[in-house]
Amino acid sequence: MARYTQRPENALKRANEFIEVGKPLRALDTLQEVFRNKRWNYAYSETVIEPLMFKYLYLCVELKKSHIAKEGLFQYRNMFQLVNVNSLENVIRGYLKMAEEHTEAAQAQSSAAVAVLELDDLDNIATPESILMSAVCGEDAQDRSDRTILLPWVKFLWESYCQCLELLRVNTHCEALYHDIARMAFQFCLKYNRKSEFRRLCDKLRKHLEDICKSSNQTTGVSINKVETQQLCLDTRLYLLDSAIQMELWQEAYKAIEDIHGLMALSKKTPVPKTMANYYQKLAMVFSKAGNQLFHAAALLKLFQLTRELKKNLTKDDLQRMAAHVLLATLSIPLPSAHPEFDRFIEADKSPLEKAQKLAVLLGLPQPPTRVSLIREVVRLNVPQLVSEDFRNLYNWLEVDFNPLNLCKRIQSIVDFIENGPENALLTPYIQSLKDVTIMRLIRQISQVYESIKFQRLLQLASFCNIFELEKLLVESVRHNDMQIRIDHQKNSIYFGTDLTESQREYRPDGPALQSMPSEQIRSQLVNMSTVLTRAVSIVYPNRERDQRAKLRNQMVSQYHEIKDREHQRILQRQKIIEDRKEYIEKQNNAREEEEARRQEEESRKAKLAEQKRLEQEQEERERKRHQNEIQAIREKSLKEKVQQISQTAHGKKMLSKLDEEGIKKLDAEQIAKRESEELQREAKELQSKLKSQEKKIDYFERAKRLEEIPLFEKYLAEKQVKDKEFWEATEKTRIENAIAERMDAVAQQERLKRMYPDRDEFLEALKKERASLYVEKLKKFEAALEAERKKRLADRIVRRREERRQAFLREKEEERLRKEEEIRLAQAAEERAAAEARRLEREAEDEKRRAQYEKQRAKEEEAERKIKEDRDRLSRELASERERTEKERDTWRPRGGDRPSASAGGSSEWRRAAPAVSERNDRGGERIERGGDRVERGGERIERGGERIERGGDRDRKDNEGADSSWRVRREPDTQRAAAPKDSGAPQSRDDKWRRGGERDRDFRNDGARRDRDDGPRRDRDDGPRRDRDDERGGFRRNDGPRRTDEPQRESGGNWRDAPRHADRENRRPAGERRDRDVRETRGDQRGSAPKEAASGGGGGNWRNAPATREEKPAAKRDQAQEKENKAGDDGEWTSVKRR
């Protein structure tokens, strides 16, 4: 049954009623059920749903249910994000406004609570409780109040911001609202100083931006390629950068700068100058806080260039102030290290060069800046001429003039000018860096003037540092600037350049220099000598260089005249190359545009598919949520019913009174039932303990009371016994008197009624006479009816008993019949089982007998094969000797130059035959005759003549020796019938002697080439491929004089084919149509007459149809024919289709 759902209007009205009676949770549940219902999604407009949504969010804010508010907002977004975006925006802004108002109210309440606490007792401000709390937790009263009152609302407001950002991040119509909420979240973090939330917010926004960049062409409607989206993201990141700087989160500020640079690089439109100026200003501030003076000065220089070029209304004072800032920041850059390769030995994630390159990219520089390059750029931009006289002197003293004795005094005057001038407050952070650079300049200049100097003298020259700072700077100069300095603490002196074997690198430091160090002079003396000698040669031979130049000029002119024509043609050809290149580039551009169009089309198609998939996933997600909501609603309903049921009992009310509404919602029905049972058990235990204690108490009091009551009871019983005796005596006396009076009244009444006896007797006699006749008449009627009913019941009883006896007889008869049938069925089943068992035993006996016969036959055949092999070897030897003798005779009588004999009509020549003069050869087991190319085989008749091969006798069917039909498909007779057959049927050879019956055939001495050629052609009857394979496997001679192909016996050495397994017969069984054709051919063969089984010993191979038969064929008996028909009708495995091997 479907669950009852309310309409939105009714739900809103009912929620207001719940709010009025002080049940906001019930009101929120009522509205939530409406939102969970899917029926209203597209059935009502925003004018109906929007007030309900505001009330829903108001209740969520009041109860601090941010997760329930998130669910409702997502449902509202899915409904109205494509219909009415303004309604969605109003709802979200209203929700955040309510959350902010409650948070501000909580903050005011917390401050008021602290004020009340502080003004509670003016005479005793530091109470013991406040002192202990401050010592334990280190917090003041305001912090504790904020944690208890303000912090829950701050958390709720933070969750609200995160939910709204997650809600609007993929909606292209709400981009402006998304960025406004992001700025509101930044203001929230600034107002309440939430640094951890600010970091999480930055990560969240960065993740959203990455998702937009990755999936701009897939599932989201927000595209980073749009100019409006890029500008909104850029403004948000700039606001993020300002907020991070205000909160002093420099790491987040740097990440924001990276995001801003990426967005500016992605944008096709150049950012406005105001944005770039703000970017460089914030970047310079971040670098300054990071302590990177080099990139700080580079950022200020970029800002100065941008302001100078694009700001038209820049005043002279502003320009002078900016120039002084840039110049002082550049001069404050520490002197570069002479050993930058030392950083390679420090393990870090990235090398300093990679980091510098990354920072240079943020400034738009092709390569990382250096102090020297920045000073050159400052001079190129004429910055020293734009600043005041003091700062211009500062540049000259540090970078131009060489005056180490007065350097620190001069710089101190500039430092005093910066510190005393209120307009120079922006330059104060550079004072310490400027002093360090001045000390390093002083040390370098002193090292070029003095070989050694006293420590006190150097301290006098470096007036703004003490001995420890000076020693530290000396060590740093040796470590980083590759200077030769040795400190002698014993003599309190400093030595410069004492080791002449060491010198500086080829890299020379910037700044003013008077002369080279002694070690540098020794290192470069060869270079100086080369320079001097070159100058001397030019003075001694002033015309040599001029003559060399004239000669070189003439060579160049002559070479030009040689190649000017080729060069002219090359220049003309270059124009054609340029045109071809332009055409090629144009084609490439067209192809690229087409490819881009195809790619965009493919991307749009993929985007549509992805959008469709997303919609399907959202639909599935909505269905899943709907299902979950329904399950949750059912659970809540059952929970409510369970709570209502429990609340009707006293212990249930007591248990529910201990839980609030939140606790009840967190429990399910089982947990509530469990708590109810626990409450019952606890109450039972408490009652039992109370009863036990009460029992002890009552027992004590009762025993004490009984002890005290015993004398009182004894006195009372004695008095009561006396009173009872007196009362009994009085009562007994009264009773006796009353009995006597009653007796006297009864006797008087009896005497008075005795005179009425005669009248009574007369009345009874008259009544008996009157009623006697009526009684007799009724008695007669009753007896008649009784007799009729007795007869009727007797007749019915006779009929019923007769029918029962008949039914019992029929039932007994039917049971007897069924019993007999069951006995017959059981007897038949027993007979069938016995017959089946007998047949099985008979088959097993036959199989065993057949197996023994097969083994015996196999042994005989193996013996016969052995004998045949011996005969074959003997015959081969005889043939070999005969062939040698014949060859000798032919060599003796061969005519000189005569032609060879021509081939016979049969296609077999004398050269091929190479046989003895006698053309007849007999072999065991059959007869084979070859004569002039004709080939006749008897015993399964086979004739070949002149390249033609004919097989007769039912397609190469062979006659059996046992007198039966020799067809290769015969009925399998039992062993008893085969045993009963006559042993000698007039056949010339028995089955044991004829080893080829059912096994291998006779050895064939056939011609190799002729037979192979004949076998390749079509056959008249059927394919003889398997037979040729069998002939080849028998290992017979291909020619009369040729060697045997193989001497291995056949894998199956013959034997009775009836002994073979039946499954092979069934596999080789041919279709019925082929069997019918074979039967027809056998019938035709029988009509023509059986072929002779053995040819005459001197027969010449005449017509085989006219050849006389050597033995009579016994016709098949009628019984066998009938049995054969029966077997053909039902093929139960006794008929097989075995190929003779």
Swiss-Prot record:
Start-end of Basic and acidic residues biased regions: 588-623, 829-899, 920-976, 990-1051, 1059-1087, 1110-1131
Q: List, alphabetically, the PROSITE patterns matched.
A: PCI
List the subcellular locations: Cytoplasm
Using the UniProt annotation, give all residue ranges assigned to the region (Disordered). 588-631, 829-1141
Chain positions with Phosphoserine modification: S908
Give the GO cellular component terms, alphabetically.
Answer: eukaryotic 43S preinitiation complex; eukaryotic 48S preinitiation complex; eukaryotic translation initiation factor 3 complex; eukaryotic translation initiation factor 3 complex, eIF3e; eukaryotic translation initiation factor 3 complex, eIF3m; multi-eIF complex
Q: Which GO terms describe its biological process?
A: formation of cytoplasmic translation initiation complex; regulation of translational initiation; translation reinitiation
Q: Which UniProt keywords apply?
A: Cytoplasm, Initiation factor, Phosphoprotein, Protein biosynthesis, RNA-binding
What are the GO MF terms of this UniProt record?
mRNA binding; translation initiation factor activity
Which HAMAP family does this entry report, sorted A to Z? eIF3a
Subunit: Component of the eukaryotic translation initiation factor 3 (eIF-3) complex. The eIF-3 complex interacts with pix.
The free-text function statement in the UniProt record for this protein reads: RNA-binding component of the eukaryotic translation initiation factor 3 (eIF-3) complex, which is involved in protein synthesis of a specialized repertoire of mRNAs and, together with other initiation factors, stimulates binding of mRNA and methionyl-tRNAi to the 40S ribosome. The eIF-3 complex specifically targets and initiates translation of a subset of mRNAs involved in cell proliferation.
Q: What is this protein called?
A: Eukaryotic translation initiation factor 3 subunit A
Q: Which species? A: Drosophila sechellia
